[in-house]
Design a protein with these regions (language model features):
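Conserved N-terminal segment of class I S-adenosyl-L-methionine
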Residues: 1-112, 126, 219-222, 229-232
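Short, surface-exposed alpha-helical recognition segments that flank or form part
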Residues: 46, 120, 214
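Redox-cofactor binding/interface segments in oxidoreductases and associated redox assembly factors
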Residues: 71, 115, 144
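Beta-hairpin (beta-strand-turn-beta-strand) motif
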Residues: 75, 118, 147-149
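S-adenosyl-L-methionine-dependent methyltransferase catalytic module, highlighting the catalytic core
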Residues: 88, 123-127, 131, 137, ...
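Conserved short-loop catalytic and cofactor-binding motifs
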Residues: 103, 116, 154-155
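Short, charge-rich binding segments
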Residues: 105-106, 133-135
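A short beta-strand submotif of the Rossmann-like class I SAM-dependent methyltransferase core
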Residues: 112-118
Length: 232
């Protein structure tokens, strides 16, 4: 990419100032029914806080998206609850046995593919996303979230993180257009995470009015919705 292309991508995808306050005070947990896993108790408490913004963005960004074939790498991803019903066929691609570094080209490509909290555990993220790209239809979507800064976990299979711009460039270079780019982080979260070697939740971060700030220069996690090129 040329320097101009990098700056153009930055200007097209970087969240605007108003983005950083839109979920400062969290709404009630979305949905009605109790489900398993992350969404079991319909509460924001007890979970790594950046995922709350990620879920809210995901719901907003995908509200008008539907299709035929949904693929995903984790059955516990909370985002699945808010999109699975809009797809007729679902394909689970777990690791093991499947490795995104060696993902073959499938006969039945995806209209939407989700692989959250995975890129930091891939030794060659570009290869993995290029393989995913080969398995997404033109005009299909991919969504992923990834830490920018994090405590060591799943060592030694933990290789790094991504800035929002790094995430945008990764997808731009693998035949995707970046539709939306989100991020969250603040200094309080960073300090608590490294001091306790754990992931702070909503209760640990909220102020007396229930607010949690999102500081643009203290990004801790980011996420992207990207669309495969070749659509009209």
């Amino acid at each position: 990419m040329t320097e101009k292309e990098i700056y153009d991508l930055y200007n097209q995808t970087t969240p605007r100032p108003e983005y950083f306050t839109k979920w400062e005070k969290l709404p009630p947990f979305p949905g009605q029914k109790e489900t398993g896993g992350w969404n079991k108790n319909r509460q924001w408490d007890g979970h790594d806080f950046p995922r709350t913004w990620c879920i809210l963005d995901f719901i907003e960004w995908t509200k008008d998206i539907s299709g035929e074939h949904l693929g995903f790498t984790c059955q516990e991803d909370p985002e699945l609850e808010f999109i699975a019903a809009k797809y007729n066929r679902h394909t689970f691609i777990p690791y093991p046995p499947y490795d995104l570094h060696e993902m073959p080209t499938l006969d039945d490509p995806f209209d939407f593919f989700i692989f959250n909290q995975t890129l930091e555990h891939l030794y060659d993220p570009y290869l993995a996303v290029a393989n995913i790209s080969k398995n997404v239809k033109a005009g299909g979507y991919v969504f992923t979230s990834v830490p920018t800064i994090n405590i060591p976990h799943m060592t030694p299979v933990h290789f790094g993180g991504f800035t929002p711009m790094g995430l945008a460039v990764l997808f731009h270079r693998t035949d995707f257009d970046v539709v939306n780019l989100g991020q969250w982080g603040n200094n309080k979260y960073i300090e608590q995470m490294f001091r306790t070697q754990s992931w702070p939740d909503y209760n640990a971060l909220k102020d007396s009015e229930g607010r949690v700030t999102n500081e643009p220069k203290n990004c801790c996690q980011c996420w992207v919705l990207a669309k495969k090129r070749g659509y009209k």
